[in-house]
Amino acid sequence: MSHPVMHTDFPGLKLLARGKVRDIYDLGETLLLVTSDRISAFDVIMNEPIPDKGFVLTEISSFWFRQMEDIVSNHIISTDVDEFPAACRPHADLLRGRSMLVKKARPLPVECIVRGYVSGSGWKEYQSSGSICGISLPPGLRESDRLPEPIFTPSTKAELGTHDENISFERMTELCGRELAEQARDYTLKIYGRARELADQKGIIIADTKFEFGVFEGELIIIDECMTPDSSRFWLKDDYRPGGPQPSFDKQFLRDYLEGLDWNKTAPAPALPAEIIAKTAQMYREALSRITGISL
């Protein structure tokens, strides 16, 4: 286990943006994405890092990007630090295993969410309206039930510290243009369809996940991350019992802990006990091992 990385600051490299988890550097023709060990919940960044989290997210994303290359191109140029531009070499030790050299795409202003099961905020919305994001669903569904077909439920991409908002597909077409919106929706459903078949063979249920897309040289490509414990809800197939919440190995463990606190879900975040940090790190490593076969 390496020393946790909360923030990066590389002399000689231009920091373009610092997101909830990733630090993005502008290398001119390309971008350098560095995945820290930060973790957020309810759109608030916690004060403590989760050891090895950056490695886990990078490896899992790389795995899924490779699996989907015949469906949609992705933004990765290389994950091998030795192939990065010379300006990155002095920082190779810190970059190794947690960074990607990527194409400079123009991101769509939406997050592309696909749900295969009724869970989380979708379950709350279904209980009150019988629908999720305006999509009517059959009556009588229980929490964590599998949906007859996966549904596409886009959201806005909120600024740091604010909350994403679910939007209709028609609103997405207004924001992105109909052609790009339809492409992103179709890619999202195809990727999810393949991923859940592959995950099923590994004893994993992908209940829902989200993707981001961008335009590079006139082509819509998938960017950011791909089906990680940060962006997905992973359940164990052997433990699946619809009718209530499911044991998961993703960020839900941390969310559940925070739900039990007297905290208003706005910054500043509460301090995380050592055992919660350790258990969260264990969940992330288990996701890596089950999905890719790689152990840390």
UniProtKB/Swiss-Prot annotation:
GO terms for molecular function: ATP binding; phosphoribosylaminoimidazolesuccinocarboxamide synthase activity. GO terms for biological process: 'de novo' IMP biosynthetic process. It comes from the Bacteria. It is an enzyme of class 6 (ligase). The keyword Acetylation does not apply. Its EC number is 6.3.2.6. The keyword Ligase applies. Pathway: Purine metabolism; IMP biosynthesis via de novo pathway; 5-amino-1-(5-phospho-D-ribosyl)imidazole-4-carboxamide from 5-amino-1-(5-phospho-D-ribosyl)imidazole-4-carboxylate: step 1/2. It catalyses: 5-amino-1-(5-phospho-D-ribosyl)imidazole-4-carboxylate + L-aspartate + ATP = (2S)-2-[5-amino-1-(5-phospho-beta-D-ribosyl)imidazole-4-carboxamido]succinate + ADP + phosphate + 2 H(+). Pfam families: SAICAR_synt. This is Phosphoribosylaminoimidazole-succinocarboxamide synthase. It comes from Pelobacter propionicus (strain DSM 2379 / NBRC 103807 / OttBd1).
